[in-house]
Amino acid sequence: MQLTAVGLNHQTAPLSIREKLAFAAEHLPDAVHALAHSPAADEAVILSTCNRTELYCVGDTERIIEWLAEYHNLPIEEIRPYLYTLDNNETIRHAFRVACGLDSMVLGEPQILGQIKDAVRIAQEQESINSHLNALFQKTFSVAKEIRTDTAVGENSVSMASASVKMAEQIFPDIADLNVLFIGAGEMIELVATYFAAKNPKLDRKSTRLNSSHLKLS
């Protein structure tokens, strides 16, 4: 058993694959408990966001990949091309980069650090984390705090949610004149809706799926 990470993100996999390998928030506690108490791993933290799914473990890399495929009921050959695997020092460096927002779609975005802290807390509650991963993530949080405090990383950073509003403002003269439809369900779409609501659009609606009625132009 060694320190390892298995994952995929917006750089390695299209949205369709990322969605298949994501862990719903309500299922994450049971999933991380199952992984850490399986033959694949002795310790585990599962980070699952809209742009990445990463399994930080003390375990066997190949068995972790097999567990991931089996958990999501997918052929291992279907997911393997999109995965990256990291060992020991590579895992440590990667955790630092992710926590600092250096591996994010929006450079320096602050939301990811809170998401990692939530993932670690869930793993602790499920008794799925021990000395190795505790040490890794305590150091990760310390490094992220230092980087964000002492460097320009994150100085002008924005979350994906606020970035979507900024992009809309560059395209449309006034968001207050728009009808806005939000498609999806989860933390990110809630944040996007909150940012747009602050701009007082004429109408905002939410839908968990796209259907033909949404495609009609008025």
What kind of feature is each model-predicted range?
Residues 1-104:
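A glycine-rich (often HGG/GG-containing) alpha/beta subdomain
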Residues 56, 192, 218:
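Short glycine-/acidic-enriched loop or helix-start segments at secondary-structure transitions
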Residues 58, 85, 154, 182, ...:
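Active-site-adjacent beta-strand anchor residues
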Residues 66, 114, 190:
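Alpha-helical elements of the RecA-like P-loop NTPase motor core of helicases
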Residues 78-176:
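Glycine/serine-rich phosphate-binding loop and adjoining beta1-alpha1 elements at the start
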Residues 168-209:
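Glycine-rich phosphate/diphosphate-binding loop of Rossmann-like nucleotide-binding domains
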Residues 206, 210-218:
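Single conserved hydrophobic/aromatic residue that forms the stacking wall/gate
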